[in-house]
Amino acid sequence: MEGSRWRFRSFLDYGSLDILQPNVCYNGGYTETLKIASLAQSHNIPIANGGGWPLHNLHTMAGLMNGWRVEFHLGMQATGELLFKDPPKPDGNIVRVSKKPGLGLEPNVDALKDTLMLPRNA
């Protein structure tokens, strides 16, 4: 999996890929992923997120002219279902984007308490 916009650009320049698979968690966030998507669109190449974390990539894919598929890994989906209240879930091959504000993800504060890390000298 690639994370650098410049590597994706090289792939596009050489016509090496038919589909790009950026991921907001590995590409430097939403803005960087949008830049990669724009590069891909200029070459008429679709985007299908790769590497999982569907809950973080769903809105990006839905909002892109060349956005295509969202990759769902069962383990990462289970993590999202633990950390967020009522996250979007696939229904067959369809996932509906939440109409809630932002990413549509409400943190499960009770579950997050179990992940809290305190400084050693606290």
Predicted feature locations:
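C-terminal extensions of enzymes
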Residues: 83-122
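Shared catalytic-loop signature of beta/alpha-barrel
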Residues: 1-94
